[in-house]
């Protein structure tokens, strides 16, 4: 059975709070506290100078927040309308307790990638707030068409098809090939994508050759771009995030609308717990039909928390990266400095004194050894006991004192975004009654992943139920299967079992390419009662198949229904590859 299931008792009723009950997998339950609006005093943000006519509402709104900090059990009301924020500083919510921010549909318009930083708060709710970007000042992304491409001169022209004028100094950060008719991320054939900002010097020169045309000369890495192709060119990728949430408990975001954000929608980390997104929207700004991106990176990124969260009734689309990514980070040992100290490499150091470090081999095998962290100094971790001889370079270290598991993702609509739908990399998850449509890559991915230089994330999964969801035309570019479960260690798979108790049941899958499920490193996997209809599209031999790979055991595949299709004649086949343990 899964471990660390939430089993919270119903909190004692009190005047200042209400409690939302969340029922998860295997009869788990947890509660999220919210301010009781009926018992809260009320103050209007206009008292502090927040005004739709103001050039910059930053200082006035910060004053309102400070008042709420000094006076808990309060509702801060923001009247409907548009409010500009031009100061290049974050709005800090630090130490607030029992505060409701009721925005009544107000929209905050930013022009710098500094938004909300929510730190050390407890029991707060932000309701009805819209956030967008001041597109009159700069753009987050643009549709471009390739013309006059030349391999000989390593150049092409970019026609900004929705703009009348473009500046030669507009940032060129990342290209993603788009469907030229639907204007959605990804193409079935000849998909291309380049994160040019990761390779300084790949763009040699940019010159303006027309009102809305730029000529790009490159180092040859973009020679496969051809005339007529349509791309989304991002001018911004990371660095920002509408809501940064750190070490905060019992926080609710309800009815939030993110229409154009530089960075992620939500970055929730640093041991936050008991949080929820209810009825929130990430999508294209309906007032700007030439804006083709919602958030330039992930919709929701949850890492190194204490979990117990819910995402329900939301609508996420057109992000520059995954809909939702749930995980905890890991680290690798780069050097053993003495009997009790190691140096580590990680993209997100999540350790603190008092934590328990758990060690695995470089192949993810559990070593049966853990130690308490006594100090963290940069990349150095010191422990409360001597390290055995087998703790060596390239061993993996995870933090046993954090767990982003115990979550429910239900009743949402995930669609037409770049990259994946859900990355589910933590324990005890329930993913049910969601709709997935035309995600560029696979709609659900379960992984433990070391990609050195980029990220190190995922501690394995014990307990995940994926049920009663619908998947339509997902995985446009066919990155693996609809449901993908695997490990990656810089391009290689682990040889051990790292995923346990995963169920995929009663889902419907329509008109997709590639396999239905691709699984490795999992024990007790159930794929039952799903419905597959691949009558549309074109012929492909792998469409709808299930493949079971190495380090799998106790796999049950039963009662799945397939509509006959000449486009997917082998969809009932189950493939086995590199199986080393009994099925």
Residue ranges and their predicted role:
Residues 47-49, 58-65, 72-99, 103-117, ...:
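N-terminal extracellular ligand-recognition/capping segment immediately after the signal peptide
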Residues 10-59:
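Right-handed parallel beta-helix/beta-solenoid
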Residues 65-69, 85-95, 246, 264-270, ...:
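Short, T/G/N/S-enriched strand-turn elements that build extracellular solenoid repeat scaffolds
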Residues 188-240, 367-369, 374-407, 415, ...:
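Small/polar beta-strand repeat architecture
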Residues 133-136, 142-144, 158-209, 347-379:
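Ser/Thr/Gly-rich low-complexity blocks that favor extended beta-strand/coil architectures
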Residues 97, 121-124, 248-252, 270-276, ...:
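Short "repeat-start/strand-capping" segments in structured domains, especially the N-termini
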Residues 73-74, 87-90, 110-115, 135-140, ...:
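Short glycine/acidic-rich loop motifs that flank beta-strands on beta-rich extracellular proteins
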């Amino acid at each position: 059975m899964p471990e660390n299931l939430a089993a919270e008792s119903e909190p004692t009723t009190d005047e200042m709070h209400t409690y939302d009950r969340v029922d998860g997998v295997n009869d788990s339950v947890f509660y999220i506290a919210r301010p009781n609006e009926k018992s809260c005093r009320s103050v209007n943000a206009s008292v502090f100078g927040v005004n739709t006519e103001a050039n910059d509402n930053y200082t006035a709104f910060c004053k309102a927040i400070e008042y709420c900090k000094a006076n808990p059990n309060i509702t801060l009301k923001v009247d409907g309308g548009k409010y500009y924020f031009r100061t290049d500083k974050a709005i800090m919510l630090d130490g607030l307790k029992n505060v409701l921010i009721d925005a009544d549909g107000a929209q905050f318009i930013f022009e710098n990638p500094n938004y909300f930083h929510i730190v050390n708060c407890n029991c707060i709710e932000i309701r009805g707030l819209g956030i967008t970007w001041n597109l009159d000042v700069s753009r987050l992304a643009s549709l471009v068409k390739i013309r006059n491409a030349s391999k000989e001169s390593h150049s092409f022209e970019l026609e900004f098809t929705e703009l009348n004028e473009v500046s030669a100094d507009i940032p060129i950060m990342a290209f993603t090939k788009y469907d030229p008719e639907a204007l959605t991320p990804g193409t079935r054939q000849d998909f291309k994508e380049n994160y040019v900002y990761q390779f300084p010097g790949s763009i040699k020169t940019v010159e303006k050759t027309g009102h809305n045309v730029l000529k790009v000369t490159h180092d040859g890495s973009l020679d496969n771009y051809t005339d007529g192709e349509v791309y989304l060119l991002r001018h911004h990728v990371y660095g920002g995030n509408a809501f940064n949430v750190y070490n905060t408990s019992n926080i609710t975001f309800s009815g939030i609308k993110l229409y154009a954000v530089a960075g992620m929608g939500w970055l929730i980390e640093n041991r936050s717990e008991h949080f929820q997104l209810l009825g929130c929207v990430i999508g294209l700004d309906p007032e700007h039909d030439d804006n083709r991106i919602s958030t330039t990176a992930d919709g929701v990124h949850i890492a190194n928390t204490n979990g117990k969260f819910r995402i329900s009734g939301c609508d996420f689309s057109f992000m520059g990266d995954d809909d939702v990514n749930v995980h905890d980070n890991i680290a690798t040992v780069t050097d053993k400095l003495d009997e009790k100290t190691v140096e580590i490499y990680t993209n997100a150091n999540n350790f603190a004194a008092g934590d328990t470090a758990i060690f695995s081999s470089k192949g993810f095998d559990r070593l049966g050894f853990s130690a308490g962290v006594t100090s963290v100094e940069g990349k150095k971790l010191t422990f409360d006991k001597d390290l055995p001889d087998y703790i060596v370079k390239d061993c993996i270290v995870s933090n046993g004192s954090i767990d982003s598991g115990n979550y429910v993702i239900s009743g949402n609509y995930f669609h037409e975004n770049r990259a994946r739908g859900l990355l589910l990399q933590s324990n005890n998850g329930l993913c049910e009654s969601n709709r997935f449509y035309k995600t560029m890559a696979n709609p659900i991915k379960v992984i433990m992943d070391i990609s050195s230089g980029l990220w190190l994330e995922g501690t394995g999964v014990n307990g995940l139920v994926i049920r009663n969801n619908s998947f339509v035309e997902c995985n446009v570019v066919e990155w693996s299967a609809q449901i993908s479960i695997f490990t990656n260690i810089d391009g290689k798979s682990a040889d051990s079992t790292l995923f346990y108790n995963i169920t995929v049941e009663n889902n419907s899958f329509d008109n997709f390419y590639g396999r239905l499920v691709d699984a490795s490193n999992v024990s007790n996997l159930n794929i039952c009662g799903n419905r597959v209809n691949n009558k549309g599209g074109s012929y492909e031999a792998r469409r709808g198949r299930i493949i079971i790979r190495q380090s799998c055991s106790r796999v049950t595949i039963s009662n799945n229904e397939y509509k006959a299709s000449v486009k997917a004649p082998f969809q009932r086949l189950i493939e086995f590859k590199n199986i080393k343990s009994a099925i």
